[in-house]
């Protein structure tokens, strides 16, 4: 039986933060039915409403094909996902997206429901973690040019590619998000962000097969707080420098987070032989708990996946004003701290304050390595901090 669309008006002051009288556009159907058309119709009606409105997917299990919801809308809009939506297995094949919200100012996504990407079959055929020349898979949920938004109390399960991708947004908050995929699921970044300003990621649990959070170029004023990450590849700034059109990264704060069993911890990564010259400045990691984390603190300015770069040409990305404060816990390998900076642009003003990282493996005590950086030391450091030599690039005075 086909899906249906119900439209009715109710008082939703407690549910909506926008208005005491809001029109609610419901998109539902029989169990396991395809509600794609109903969702698009509901969103179109809500987007044209003269007052704040709500799109509601009720409790239940539904199928959802490629769904692109585009503004601008006449008034703020709330998208409430109470049910569980799964990919339909057809309309997203060969596409790079599943659910898209774009060009919306004044937006809420909530409801306690789940976006189920059903990625298990796709992961087996995915080789994007081995080569850049691979077939792209759909990102589960994209936010493109979305401003003044709150995304809260939703789950992303088993994404085929990234769980959430956030591009060119302003004043967005992610709160109490759950992201779930197996550790072996390739390219399933939890939240990837680029060219946004004023984003907060709070009280969120991420277990996935790639970076829990990855910060791309052009990010400004990002706060990541009270996030639990693991399994996964840690919290990363970068990679930066692969493309010539990239922009500076400024004011990134990661605080009061816990990393558990991740293959990397707190990481900044830039490409050698970079295609641009940009700056990443004001990056602060503080009050972090580590539990069996490999490579807990890592600056890698020789990041070169798929061997698609020339490591003989140093990275042209400048890293300035970087701090690691009150980082404590256990490492799964002896490389507790590794600061591998560019010989073309040595890291500037890197501060290491009060770190205590323990390792008890058979290959010796934990190490603290520095290349092309002389960090400022504050408080105590375990392992004992290096005072790294600065190696000048050829032709530099």
Swiss-Prot record:
Q: What is its main location?
A: secreted
Carbohydrate-modified residues are 171, 256
Output the GO biological process annotations, alphabetical, semicolon-separated.
carbohydrate metabolic process; cell wall organization
Active site per database record: 210, 233
* First and last residue of the signal peptide: 1-22
Q: List the disulfide bonds.
A: 212-229, 341-347, 370-386
* Superkingdom of this protein's organism: Eukaryota
**Which tissues does it occur in?**
Pollen.
State the reactions this protein catalyses.
Answer: (1,4-alpha-D-galacturonosyl)n+m + H2O = (1,4-alpha-D-galacturonosyl)n + (1,4-alpha-D-galacturonosyl)m
GO MF terms listed in the record are:
polygalacturonase activity
What family, per the record? Belongs to the glycosyl hydrolase 28 family.
- PANTHER family from the entry? PTHR31375
User: How is this protein named in the record?
Assistant: Polygalacturonase
């Amino acid at each position: 039986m086909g899906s249906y669309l119900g439209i009715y008006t109710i008082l939703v002051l407690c549910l909506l933060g926008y208005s005491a009288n809001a029109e609610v556009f419901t998109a539902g159907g029989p169990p396991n039915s395809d509600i794609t058309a109903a969702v698009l119709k509901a969103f179109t009606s809500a987007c044209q409403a003269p007052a704040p409105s709500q799109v509601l997917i009720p409790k239940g299990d539904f199928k959802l094909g490629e769904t692109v919801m585009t503004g601008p809308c006449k008034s703020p809009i709330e998208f409430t996902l109470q049910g569980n939506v799964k990919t339909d297995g057809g309309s997203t094949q060969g596409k790079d997206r599943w659910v898209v919200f774009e060009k919306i100012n004044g937006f809420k996504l909530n409801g306690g429901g789940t976006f189920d990407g059903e990625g298990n079959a796709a992961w087996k055929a995915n080789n994007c973690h081995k080569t850049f020349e691979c077939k792209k898979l759909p990102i589960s949920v994209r936010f493109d040019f979305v401003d003044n938004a709150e995304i809260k109390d939703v789950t992303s399960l088993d994404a085929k590619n990234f769980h959430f991708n956030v591009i060119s947004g302003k004043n967005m908050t992610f709160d109490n998000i759950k992201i779930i995929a197996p550790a072996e699921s390739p390219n399933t970044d939890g939240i990837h962000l680029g060219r946004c300003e004023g984003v907060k990621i709070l009280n969120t649990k991420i277990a996935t097969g790639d970076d829990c959070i990855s910060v791309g170029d052009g990010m400004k004023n990002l706060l990541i707080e009270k996030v639990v990450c693991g399994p996964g590849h840690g919290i990363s700034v970068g990679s930066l420098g692969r493309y010539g059109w990239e922009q500076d990264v400024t004011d990134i704060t990661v605080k009061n987070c816990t990393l558990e069993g991740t293959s990397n911890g707190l990481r900044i990564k830039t490409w050698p032989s970079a295609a641009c010259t940009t700056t990443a400045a004001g990056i602060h990691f503080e009050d972090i708990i580590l539990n069996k984390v490999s490579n807990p603190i890592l600056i890698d300015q020789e990041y070169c996946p798929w061997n698609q770069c020339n490591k003989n040409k140093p990275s042209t990305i400048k890293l300035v004003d970087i701090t690691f404060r009150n980082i404590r816990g256990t490492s799964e390998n002896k490389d507790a701290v590794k600061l591998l900076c560019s010989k073309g642009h040595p890291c500037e003003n890197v501060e290491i304050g009060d770190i205590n990282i323990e390792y008890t493996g058979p290959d010796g005590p934990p190490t603290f390595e520095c290349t092309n950086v002389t960090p400022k030391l504050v408080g105590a450091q375990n392992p004992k901090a290096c005072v790294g030599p600065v190696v000048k690039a050829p032709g530099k005075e």
